[in-house]
Amino acid sequence: MKIIKNIFNKIDPHFQKGGKFEKMYPAYDAFRTMAFVPSHTSTSGAHIRDAVDLKRTMITVIIALLPALFFGMWNIGQLHFSAIGEQFTLMEAFMFGFWKMLPMILVSYGVGLGIEFAFAISRGHQVNEGYLVTGLLIPMVMPVDVPLWMLAVSVVFAVIIGKEVFGGTGMNILNPALTARAFLFFAYPSWMSGDQVWISGLSEIDGVSGATPLADLASETNILELERYSYSISDMLFG
């Protein structure tokens, strides 16, 4: 870590006021404070000097999100393999979901942080760290089969309209992740609603769900007759 810190100390003057990269200071500061605790303190009032800043707080929130993210990845895989009738292990289901989610997470962070850096540099203020959490929440609330370009457009709308126009992190009245989902719902409703079931790479699967099976279930008077659908009471209760 000392080597990395020496590198930052060496290039630091180029990003300070009067340096040739002065305008890029917000981007430089974002990377430096991600690696090391900021050296500055608040200007007034009672405060305690410690290593917990907004970046570290956001990292804590990300760690809290990981169990839900990992479960979602596994669930994507197990629903896929169950629908096509194949045997699978826990790791196979998890890795299937992992490779489906990874591009979405990369696009979300790439587009969102790019906008955050652009706004910070143009305004001359520090990069808002709030998107570290938002960038993970947006893929988690989106359909797994949404095209990446739609995801990117939703991220642009959420960050600019749902956040930056209000002043950035802490001043927005809209939740950026839900704003992205709402935008996609109204702009491309066919991707967000309907009775189509997602099964990766397969369209010929029949009988998983849909309007007809659900209508048949709703019209049954004897719960025992539901056994012909291979739905147990526990399946209907817990999913």
Predicted features along the sequence, with ranges:
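N-terminal signal-anchor module of multipass membrane proteins
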Residues: 1-105, 109
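Lipid-exposed faces of alpha-helical membrane segments in multi-pass integral membrane proteins
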Residues: 67, 71-74, 111, 115, ...
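Central hydrophobic cores of alpha-helical transmembrane segments in multi-pass inner-membrane proteins
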Residues: 104-118, 135, 155-163
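Alpha-helical transmembrane segments within multi-pass membrane transporters and channels
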Residues: 149-166, 170-175
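Short, amphipathic, aromatic/basic-enriched membrane-interface segments that mark the entry/exit
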Residues: 52-53, 99-101, 117-127, 143-146
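Long hydrophobic alpha-helical segments that form multi-pass transmembrane helix bundles
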Residues: 170-239
